[in-house]
Regions:
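Helix-coil-helix junctions within alpha-helical repeat/solenoid scaffolds
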Residues: 1-173
Length: 173
């Protein structure tokens, strides 16, 4: 990332959040790619832009981009990131207090990841749903969901996802 792009980020709660200028840069890059009909990794790029909007407090813009990403999944058949897109939708919905809809998206993400045998995506979605259930007081359900998924992994325990899963499971004990 160049110095100009780096300067438009700010650090917040362990995550980078793009300021307005950074969002504009991302939108410009996406528009340029679209203009030349470059669709390589289009859905994850839309997902990243949606996350940036969500972190900037622009949930509706994020949901619009995620809807566009899911339409691209259908149009192009680029399903590799489909489960993650549903998980991100769930996170955005949670940010605007739409827990029921978020749970549906997390469950859908888990089902898609399971069907694709995408264990990392399934772990992420299980973490998100387990957090929601924990926050709703459903400790047993959260643990029963997450523990077996976490148990599949035999390496990579220094990754953010596995660290998050371990910490969540310890909190559910």
């Amino acid at each position: 990332m160049n110095a100009g792009a780096t300067s438009v980020r700010k650090r917040s709660a362990g995550n980078f959040v793009l300021c307005d200028q950074g969002l504009e840069m991302m939108r410009g890059a996406m528009a340029a790619a679209k203009k030349i009909n470059s669709k390589m990794l289009w859905t994850p790029h839309l997902g990243s832009l949606a996350l940036a909007h969500a972190r900037a407090g622009q949930a509706e813009a994020a949901l619009h981009l995620l809807s566009e990403a899911l339409a691209a999944v259908e149009d192009m058949g680029e399903r590799m990131f489909e489960a993650e897109l549903h998980r991100i939708i769930g996170d955005v919905l949670l940010s605007v207090q739409r827990q029921g809809e978020a749970q549906v998206e997390f469950t859908r993400a888990i089902a898609i990841a399971r069907q694709q045998q995408a264990k990392s995506w399934q772990l992420r979605a299980a973490i998100s749903l387990a957090r929601l259930w924990r926050d709703q007081g459903k400790m047993v359900e959260a643990r029963e969901l997450l523990a077996p998924v976490y148990g599949w992994f035999t390496e990579g325990f220094d990754t953010r996802d596995l660290k998050d899963a371990k910490a969540l499971l310890e909190g559910l004990a």
